[in-house]
Curated annotation (Swiss-Prot):
Keywords: Allosteric enzyme, Cytoplasm, Hydrolase, Metal-binding, Protease, Sodium, Threonine protease. Belongs to the peptidase T1B family. HslV subfamily. This is ATP-dependent protease subunit HslV. The active site is at residue 12. It comes from Paramagnetospirillum magneticum (strain ATCC 700264 / AMB-1). GO terms for biological process: proteolysis involved in protein catabolic process. Its EC number is 3.4.25.2. Na(+) binds at residues 167, 170, 173. Signal peptide: none annotated. It is found in: Cytoplasm. The keyword Calcium does not apply. Allosterically activated by HslU binding.
Length: 182
């Protein structure tokens, strides 16, 4: 079987949103290889930086952990400066031959800012404070945008509802959610 005909790893829907001074990152638990579910309870959302930063990652697992380790190192070097740490990581990502081949994306957030780190080494801040990445990211993003202005729904409720909608549409997303908030 040639490398290009090998089944690819799929999975992960990560959603980050802000509402009423709260920030939430939610991730599903499914990892698939081709049409097979390999794991249903993977943890793709974490707190780092002493619990002050939320991270959700999508893409190849080993690559995502490599980037997470690099981000943690940048945060140690630039404590309390999430944007600067992400920009420094992006610089490395663009210039390091090894990192350039990593296939992963991350959504990161602290109390002030939410950012996407793309597979091309970009750092993007969404204009509406809502991020959706991974196989079901666009579904979760659309659902969160539809729910965000509804009175009585807090950030975690919106995240859970949006992720449930994504899980109902995307075959690479399940309903086993991990939610972290600040």
């Amino acid at each position: 079987m040639s490398e290009s005909s090998l089944p690819s790893w799929h999975g992960t829907t990560i959603l980050c949103l802000r509402k009423d001074g709260r920030v939430v990152i939610a991730g599903d638990g499914q990892v698939s290889l081709g049409a097979t579910v390999i794991k249903g309870n993977a943890r793709k959302v974490r707190k780092v930086g002493g619990g002050s930063i939320l991270v959700g990652f999508a893409g190849a697992t080993a690559d995502a952990f490599t980037l997470l380790e690099r981000l943690e190192a940048k945060l140690e070097k630039h404590p309390g400066q999430l944007t600067r740490a992400c920009v420094e990581l992006a610089k490395d990502w663009r210039t390091d031959r090894y990192l350039r081949r990593l296939e992963a994306m991350m959504a990161v957030a602290d109390k002030d800012v939410s950012l996407v780190l793309t597979g091309q080494g970009d750092v993007l801040e969404p204009e509406d404070g809502i991020i959706g990445i991974g196989s079901g990211g666009n579904y979760a993003l659309a659902a969160a945008r539809a729910l965000i202005d509804i009175d009585g729904l807090d950030a975690e409720t919106i995240a859970r509802k949006a992720m449930a909608i994504a899980a109902g549409i995307c075959v690479y997303t399940n309903g086993n959610m991990i939610v972290e908030s600040l």
